[in-house]
Amino acid sequence: MNRSLMSLLGREGLGEKITDATPLPDTAETIHISSLALLKMLQHARAGVPLEVMGLMLGELIDEYTIRVIDVFAMPQSGTSVSVEAIDPVFQTKMLDMLKQTGRDEIVIGWYHSHPGFGCWLSSVDVNTQQSFEQLQSRAVAVVVDPLQSVRGKVVIDAFRTIKTSPTAEPRQITSNLGHLQDPSIQALIHGLNRNYYSIAINYRKNELEQKMLLNLHKKKWTEGLIVDKFDTHEQSNEKQINNLLELTKQYQKSIQDEDKIEPEKKEVSAVGKLDPKRHLISDVHTLMANNVVRVLTVMLDTVTF
């Protein structure tokens, strides 16, 4: 309801007459993005910072209300402002032919590009690019991802489609999508959200293989324990830790001497907000001994094995 009212207000601001037959944006669809596609989009977007990058999305149209994005691939275009260059048709054709040889028979259902640091919305050039996609596929989608605002556990991403100025087909009935769409930002509203284009709900699906892939993404291997640092690096690390232990020892000795000068009723609050040298000294000694014991055993094992 809020998005409908905002759309009507936006059209009224443009001087359009509001009637009962005025078509509203169709936001009933849901885009299901696979984990592989999401990871590849984020990796490509972060590699291109501070420039914008773009790519194409491969997937399938499940039904009238569901679009599934299975995979993506990067395009050689990049941009320096809030827009990217046009699509390279030669590169796109060659890439699709090579993907078909690997078993990727999905069609191009849209494109994605990055907005590093300034949110998810479409510029005027992006709207024109999206309209060119919709001429080939009426249900094409434009996905925008912000790699700088994205943090672990929360990805700043949104999907858009342009609003037809003079639709010929009757708009279909849709259900409420309240709670599924992201709240629009002020910057997106200024740049034409709900006026030139509208947002589409995004969902993330994970099958059994994708769950295993995500679990093994940063999984450590047992062979990492056999890796030995350089002797010069290890010597410098030991020297730094020993100097730190010497400094903590002096602080601990000074704290013991100061305890005799402090009144008994003030001893409980005298150490509040200060570094506890005794606790840090014990922790650093255990860490230093454990690291050196593990290193000696690793060097002995490597010498005998190799």
Swiss-Prot record:
<keyword id="KW-0645">Protease</keyword>
<keyword id="KW-0378">Hydrolase</keyword>
<dbReference type="GO" id="GO:0005634">
    <property type="term" value="C:nucleus"/>
</dbReference>
<dbReference type="Pfam" id="PF23594">
    <property type="entry name" value="RPN11_C"/>
</dbReference>
<feature type="short sequence motif" description="JAMM motif">
    <location>
        <begin position="113"/>
        <end position="126"/>
    </location>
</feature>
<feature type="binding site">
    <location>
        <position position="115"/>
    </location>
    <ligand>
        <name>Zn(2+)</name>
    </ligand>
</feature>
<keyword id="KW-0647">Proteasome</keyword>
<dbReference type="GO" id="GO:0008541">
    <property type="term" value="C:proteasome regulatory particle, lid subcomplex"/>
</dbReference>
<comment type="similarity">
    <text>Belongs to the peptidase M67A family. PSMD14 subfamily.</text>
</comment>
<dbReference type="InterPro" id="IPR037518">
    <property type="entry name" value="MPN"/>
</dbReference>
<dbReference type="GO" id="GO:0046872">
    <property type="term" value="F:metal ion binding"/>
</dbReference>
<dbReference type="GO" id="GO:0045335">
    <property type="term" value="C:phagocytic vesicle"/>
</dbReference>
<keyword id="KW-0482">Metalloprotease</keyword>
<dbReference type="InterPro" id="IPR056263">
    <property type="entry name" value="RPN11_C"/>
</dbReference>
<dbReference type="InterPro" id="IPR050242">
    <property type="entry name" value="JAMM_MPN+_peptidase_M67A"/>
</dbReference>
<keyword id="KW-0833">Ubl conjugation pathway</keyword>
<dbReference type="GO" id="GO:0000502">
    <property type="term" value="C:proteasome complex"/>
</dbReference>
<dbReference type="GO" id="GO:0043161">
    <property type="term" value="P:proteasome-mediated ubiquitin-dependent protein catabolic process"/>
</dbReference>
<feature type="binding site">
    <location>
        <position position="126"/>
    </location>
    <ligand>
        <name>Zn(2+)</name>
    </ligand>
</feature>
<keyword id="KW-0862">Zinc</keyword>
<dbReference type="GO" id="GO:0140492">
    <property type="term" value="F:metal-dependent deubiquitinase activity"/>
</dbReference>
<dbReference type="InterPro" id="IPR000555">
    <property type="entry name" value="JAMM/MPN+_dom"/>
</dbReference>
<feature type="domain" description="MPN">
    <location>
        <begin position="31"/>
        <end position="166"/>
    </location>
</feature>
<comment type="subunit">
    <text>Component of the 19S regulatory cap of the 26S proteasome.</text>
</comment>
<protein>
    <recommendedName>
        <fullName>26S proteasome non-ATPase regulatory subunit 14</fullName>
        <ecNumber>3.4.19.-</ecNumber>
    </recommendedName>
</protein>
<dbReference type="GO" id="GO:0070628">
    <property type="term" value="F:proteasome binding"/>
</dbReference>
<keyword id="KW-0479">Metal-binding</keyword>
<feature type="binding site">
    <location>
        <position position="113"/>
    </location>
    <ligand>
        <name>Zn(2+)</name>
    </ligand>
</feature>
<comment type="function">
    <text>Metalloprotease component of the 26S proteasome that specifically cleaves 'Lys-63'-linked polyubiquitin chains. The 26S proteasome is involved in the ATP-dependent degradation of ubiquitinated proteins. The function of the 'Lys-63'-specific deubiquitination of the proteasome is unclear.</text>
</comment>
<dbReference type="Pfam" id="PF01398">
    <property type="entry name" value="JAB"/>
</dbReference>
